[in-house]
Amino acid sequence: MDAIGAYPHRMSDTERRACLRRAVIASTVGTTIEWYDFLIYSVVTGLVFGTLYFPDADPVVGALKAFGVFFVGFTARPIGPVIFGHYGDRIGRKATLIATLLMTGIATAAVGMVPGYDTIGIWGGIILTVLRVIQGIGVGGEWGGSVLLAMEWARTNKNRGFLASWPQIGAPLGTCLANISVLGFGWLSGDQFLNWGWRIPFLLSIVMVGIGLWIRVGILETPVFQRLITDKKIERAPTLEVLKRQPRQVILAALLRLAEQSPGYIFSVFVFTYGTTFLGASRNLLLSASITGTILGSFWVPIAGALSDRIGRRQTYIIGCASVAAFIFVYFALLGTKVPGLMFLAIALSFIPVMTLYGAEAALISEAFTPRLRYSGASIGYQLASIIAGGPAPFISAWLFAAYHSTVPIGIYVVICAVISVVSAALLTDYTNKDTSLEVRYGNV
């Protein structure tokens, strides 16, 4: 019996395709909204928060403080899998995804209402920190469910990489929407953007969350999870069980993402502070280039996912690691010319090598875990990378540049991350084109 057969009535091919299509749309739209919520903060951090909430005579110190609060959201992200991974493996993917969408959206809208330092002093920064933690928890619980919602509806084993990559499009699309919203209101004259214009993109989250909820409420639970219910394979404490039974996979999943997380946040966050403060680039140039890059990246993600189905997850990922390690030096060399056209080209192209990794990793990580522990295990491993790589990357980059007055150390830092990721990919089992819907595939786990 296949996973679809776990439903009370056996679905026709037409019904199955309709459910698959709706699940992919729901997961992709949902992750786009959640990443918009999380990344609008990232974009505005480099443009506004250092000045508005951490006014310091030294712009580098102000930027470091702002990036410190930015990093707090990443430290909170592993809490999301502990909470929502537990319920995702116990009550299902659907209900959990509705909860994560609400949590992140409400916190994001609240950020747009926080007064600046001139009004409430240091409390503005404190409130931002609390809201950033809530954002991090919501986003941390989102990823695993979204990927599984799409991947676990696959009828064959030959296109799981492609299906699992669709929720990954949410990151570049969310970044694109965040940049577009900031760019749109960035045309405000004088200090209007700094005073109030930046708040509107955060408040728009309320509308986007409403759309996401409408889509997600109508989806069915995945056949793989439905089968776990039918076979009575639900764990009482899935988070504890996955740490006990598959700790190696959790650690490797976290280390695997270093090559994607570190350069990803250098390209999408650090570049705004580096470009405006040290290169004298206009905010609109950086935003326009980033928007172009996210559009290119959105198209590239499913291509990378499909490539992982064809040549294997591991091979695709290693190619991506090599691309990132080589491109980081070209990237900073082009930015260093201060020629607007070359700077635009560097930023726009920077998303391609990162999205190669992003498109392959969803299936590579998720397939490493047995179905009854998959939401918890994949989510914990995935989000641990946010603490050790993604969150610290802008902070480390700013510190390295301040200490050495050169971008070469930043490039070396990215190369080290890429090497670690290659080793992790080599050690993580590749389940390309193998049936991962059955518990027996994973032995005595």
Feature locations, PLM:
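Multi-pass alpha-helical transporter architecture, strongest
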Residues: 212-219, 416-445
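Helix-loop-helix hairpin linking two adjacent transmembrane segments in secondary transporters
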Residues: 171-216
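C-terminal transmembrane helical hairpin of 12-TM major facilitator-type secondary transporters
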Residues: 314-360
